[in-house]
Amino acid sequence: MMEGLSPASSLPLLLLLLSPAPEAALPLPSSTSCCTQLYRQPLPSRLLRRIVHMELQEADGDCHLQAVVLHLARRSVCVHPQNRSLARWLERQGKRLQGTVPSLNLVLQKKMYSHPQQQN
């Protein structure tokens, strides 16, 4: 993990975090392996269509936040595990694939619904 950022390297990251586009908002930095912030807003369908694969980041050991990491072609986006738009998308994917949903999707859905907090 990175120990710290210089002010010059923090500015581009800050600008990305303030960007309204979710795919640019919280990219997973290539030099780290853990999400440090989570995207909590509804996910646009154009972003969901571009998912190459997903993984679940557990809040244990090296990483301090539980997150769903959406890997796109050129970047990764860290999403809150209870994001409602992600849950709806996973549900639609499950219906579309009719029982062939990868086990990760089932694990994600189980974890999302095991903590009944209000989330987008």
Curated annotation (Swiss-Prot):
The keyword Disulfide bond applies. GO terms for biological process: immune response; mononuclear cell migration; positive regulation of mononuclear cell migration; positive regulation of T cell chemotaxis; regulation of actin cytoskeleton organization. InterPro entries: Chemokine_IL8-like_dom, Interleukin_8-like_sf. Residues 1-25 form the signal peptide. Disulfide bonds join C34-C63, C35-C78. One of its GO terms (cellular component) is nucleus. Pfam families: IL8. Gene3D superfamilies: 2.40.50.40. SUPFAM superfamilies: Interleukin 8-like chemokines (SSF54117). Chemotactic factor that attracts skin-associated memory T-lymphocytes. May play a role in mediating homing of lymphocytes to cutaneous sites. May play a role in cell migration during embryogenesis. Nuclear forms may facilitate cellular migration by inducing cytoskeletal relaxation. Binds to CCR10. This is C-C motif chemokine 27. It comes from Mus musculus (Mouse). The gene is Ccl27.
